[in-house]
């Protein structure tokens, strides 16, 4: 059976998120930090680590999931490590019968009725606030599944409120990183962008708990 190489080298900030032992994780970052890659890899590793696991990656829309995350996921999982790839349903089944599937929060009814082991909510700040408490959270209950929220900030909205509540909960971890801390965008490039568009500011002060 083909073996998936799980020995990816993570950047230090990515590793701090990845290795957290908390059941729920919230990651707030600037754009181009690498959060989508990290969240998908978290699903891949967990799907590979046990049989018959069901893992969802939920983007604000199906179109976003297909355009961005699907390409990354197929790069992370070589064809030889897959039992089945379904381009229509944006799903990959591994040889251990675990499944990773991409969805859009714009069709919430398509999410219901499935028990999840692991789930990522990508750009949760830009989803309907009810997506988590009314749709996704109950899907984790019977399997005691784990969740990761990744998003750039969008004012003092529901994502901000969840982040602040999470800081007071023992089973949650919160992470807060600037774009430049991801290591993908150089300081020179960021300085150039801010000079051209003064509205562009550092995402946030680095914080971790």
Question: In which residue ranges do the predicted regions lie?
Answer:
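Phosphate/NTP-binding elements of NTP-utilizing enzymes
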Residues: 1-209
């Amino acid at each position: 059976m083909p073996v998936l190489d799980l020995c990816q080298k993570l950047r230090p900030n990515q590793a701090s998120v990845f290795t957290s032992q908390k059941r729920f994780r919230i990651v707030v970052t600037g754009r181009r930090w690498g959060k989508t890659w990290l969240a998908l890899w978290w699903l891949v590793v967990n799907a590979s680590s046990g049989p018959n696991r069901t893992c969802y990656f939920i983007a604000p829309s199906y179109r976003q999931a297909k355009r961005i995350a699907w390409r990354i996921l197929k790069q992370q999982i070589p064809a030889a490590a897959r039992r089945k790839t379904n381009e229509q349903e944006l799903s990959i089944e591994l040889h251990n019968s675990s499944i990773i599937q991409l969805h859009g929060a714009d069709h919430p009814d398509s999410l219901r009725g499935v028990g999840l082991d692991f789930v990522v909510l990508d750009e949760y700040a830009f989803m309907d606030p009810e997506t988590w408490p009314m749709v996704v959270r109950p899907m984790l209950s019977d399997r005691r599944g784990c969740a990761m929220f990744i998003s750039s900030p969008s004012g003092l909205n529901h994502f901000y409120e969840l982040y602040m509540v999470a800081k007071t909960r023992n089973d949650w971890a919160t992470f807060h990183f600037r774009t430049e801390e991801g290591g993908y965008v150089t300081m020179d490039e960021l300085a150039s962008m801010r000079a051209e568009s003064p509205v562009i500011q550092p995402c946030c002060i680095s914080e971790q708990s």
